[in-house]
């Protein structure tokens, strides 16, 4: 598939978000979370774009909170986005930070004794067989215009990227997000979290300003305590990440780096041993 076709498909998926992102980013800089540090807008992503914790999160003992019953949730970290041949491969996420940072987060969560649930949630862009409204139908069709994928290639497009597939263990959940931007609608995730008495959800994935943010908002509205690992998430465009991270951090959840996540878990383990 030629690069131009990739770009048309990738841009169409985000087209209607442009005005929303601009408006919310402006709101976050006009006094909401005014103490948040300036992110490096020109950075290619990663920990340098992660804002300082918003004032409300600084009042919390994050070590204690991250020692509560927890779940790890990966969103849309599939071959579609990480492989050059994928439907969204032109975004070049393999060249960015989300994959190595996610591996770091998963390994740390596995080593902790309070992570009760691991979910690997796919997001298919080929959604012709999904339940859909009139809006969904035209949006889903627009995402894949010009793409000529066989059924086998469509299936491979939505497979978990190999580096993360190697980290999946028996008992982990693997399923697809069915709604536009929330895994809390129409999937087994709510029952999984409820049955395992989860309080905290740690999110990684793509796209930061779409499914990750949507799931973070849903987690808050359902009474959970979400964390977003900033360098383990990507927007479609790196330049959109600072605004998205600030917005999530100001309104919905603490945004921390993968290194800080590991340190907080280690501190919690040390406290329990003491």
Ranges and model annotations:
Residues 202-206, 223-238:
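A short glycine-rich beta-strand->turn/loop micro-motif centered on a GG-aromatic cluster
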Residues 42-170, 264-273:
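Active-site acidic carboxylates
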Residues 154-198:
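Internal catalytic-core helix/loop-beta-alpha segment
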Residues 13-21, 27-29:
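N-terminal export leaders
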Residues 254-261:
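Short acidic-hydrophobic, aromatic-tinged amphipathic segments that line or gate anion-handling sites
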Residues 1-15, 38:
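N-terminal secretory signal peptides
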Residues 33-34, 39-44:
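Boundary at the C-terminal end of the N-terminal hydrophobic targeting segment
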């Amino acid at each position: 598939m030629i690069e131009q076709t990739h770009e048309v498909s990738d841009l169409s998926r985000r087209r209607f978000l442009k005005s929303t992102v601009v408006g919310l980013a402006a709101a976050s800089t006009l006094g909401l979370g005014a103490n948040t540090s300036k992110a490096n807008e020109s950075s290619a992503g990663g920990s340098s774009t992660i804002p300082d914790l918003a004032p409300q999160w600084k009042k919390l003992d994050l070590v204690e909170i991250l020692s509560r019953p927890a779940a790890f949730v990966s969103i849309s970290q599939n071959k579609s986005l990480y492989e050059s041949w994928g439907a969204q491969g032109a975004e070049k996420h393999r060249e960015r930070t989300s994959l190595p940072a996610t591996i770091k987060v998963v390994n740390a969560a596995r080593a902790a004794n309070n992570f009760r649930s691991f979910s690997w949630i796919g997001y298919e862009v080929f959604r012709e067989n999904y339940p859909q409204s009139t809006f969904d139908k035209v949006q889903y069709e627009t995402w894949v215009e010009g793409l000529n994928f066989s059924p086998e290639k469509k299936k491979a497009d939505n497979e978990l990227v190999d580096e993360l597939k190697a980290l999946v263990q028996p008992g982990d959940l693997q399923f697809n997000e069915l709604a536009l931007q929330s895994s809390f609608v129409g999937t087994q995730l709510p029952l999984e979290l409820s049955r395992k008495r989860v309080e905290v959800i740690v999110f990684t994935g793509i796209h930061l300003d779409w499914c990750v943010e949507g799931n973070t908002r849903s987690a808050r509205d359902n009474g959970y305590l979400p964390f977003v690992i900033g360098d383990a998430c990507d927007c479609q465009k790196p330049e959109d990440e600072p605004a998205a991270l600030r917005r999530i951090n100001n309104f919905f959840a603490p945004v921390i780096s993968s290194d800080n996540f590991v340190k907080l878990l280690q501190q919690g383990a040390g406290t329990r041993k003491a």
